[in-house]
Amino acid sequence: MADIWTDYGVPGAIIVAQILALMVPILVSVAFLVYAERKVLGLMQLRQGPNMVGPWGILQSFADALKMIGKETIIPAGANRIIFLAAPMLTMMLALAAWAVIPFGEGLVISDINVGILYLLAISSQGVYGIIMAGWASNSKYAFLGGLRSAAQMVSYEVSIGLVIITVLLCVGSLNLSDVVEAQKTVWFAIPLLPMFVIFFISALAETNRAPFDLPEGESELVGGFHTEYSGMAFGLFFLGEYANMILMSAMTSVLFLGGWLPPLDVAPLNWVPGPIWFILKICFCLFLFVWVRATVPRYRYDQLMRLGWKVFLPFSLVWVILTAGVLVTFDWLPK
């Protein structure tokens, strides 16, 4: 860290400030996302949800976090101590690292690299390692089964996500996420690529281990899944990582299909609203869909999950990629 100040001086300080300015709001937004999820679930189930800590219960998540920090991290007998403790840290670190290439507005991105989508795919595919490490190092059959399920599930649906992204790239001609947003000035990709938008969102549910695809932590079958043996802040890091990944996948959905920071129509007064506000509103919409699905759709069986990924999404995505490429070539619509 000292070399940063020596070699780069003020630019080094700016880099650190940018990282903190991104990480702190994400961590705080996780707390409010948990509160919002519990409130929405309460309304859907005809009850109040959190309502005691702070006005309207808005401080409930912070109270839960303080309680969790005070809990002891118990390491099971026979567990691999180093890997057991490294797994939640790896999961949380990867969930935050992926945000480096997400554009919040025009020019508002930490690293505007030309291979931003490849970077996101690479980072998101590493997330399975933290879960496998947790399952194996816990020395528990329930945690191990949860880790195996997660590995199969995430690998299966990353294939579909990759094919969906290829379809978007065919329409854009660039791997830069800012270019993807700029290409949607005329029409959001969610309209012409509606089936791929649906596949991407459902695959995002599976990628983040959210209902109805929360089999790696299926409480009715595996106690708590891969984090059965975790407690205290080690469990808290897994919890933070899961919700940070939810926000990340919502941001990716917004960038790839909902026009990122662009307004629905480029007319007044919609274009008076700053781009980052539109981006945050679209993320909130996607997060509401996450919660809505959790409240209304029952958990899939494992064979149904695999069948959906390999026998439905994979062939359909392949056909749609070929169809999109054919239409672009036939009508000479390939991006220049």
Curated annotation (Swiss-Prot):
Disulfide bonds: none annotated. GO terms for biological process: aerobic respiration. Its EC number is 7.1.1.-. It holds the Pfam family NADHdh. The keyword Translocase applies. The chain crosses the membrane at residues 14-34, 82-102, 115-135, 161-181, 186-206, 247-267, 273-293, 312-332. InterPro entries: NADH_UbQ_OxRdtase_su1/FPO, NADH_UbQ_OxRdtase_su1_CS. It is an enzyme of class 7 (translocase). It is found in: Cell inner membrane. Its main location: membrane. GO terms for molecular function: NADH dehydrogenase activity; oxidoreductase activity, acting on NAD(P)H, quinone or similar compound as acceptor; quinone binding. Keywords: Cell inner membrane, Cell membrane, Membrane, NAD, Quinone, Translocase, Transmembrane, Transmembrane helix, Ubiquinone. The keyword Cell inner membrane applies. It comes from the Bacteria. It is a multi-pass membrane protein. One of its GO terms (cellular component) is plasma membrane. PROSITE patterns: COMPLEX1_ND1_1, COMPLEX1_ND1_2. Belongs to the complex I subunit 1 family. NDH-1 is composed of 14 different subunits. Subunits NuoA, H, J, K, L, M, N constitute the membrane sector of the complex. NDH-1 shuttles electrons from NADH, via FMN and iron-sulfur (Fe-S) centers, to quinones in the respiratory chain. The immediate electron acceptor for the enzyme in this species is believed to be ubiquinone. Couples the redox reaction to proton translocation (for every two electrons transferred, four hydrogen ions are translocated across the cytoplasmic membrane), and thus conserves the redox energy in a proton gradient. This subunit may bind ubiquinone. This is NADH-quinone oxidoreductase subunit H. The gene is nuoH.
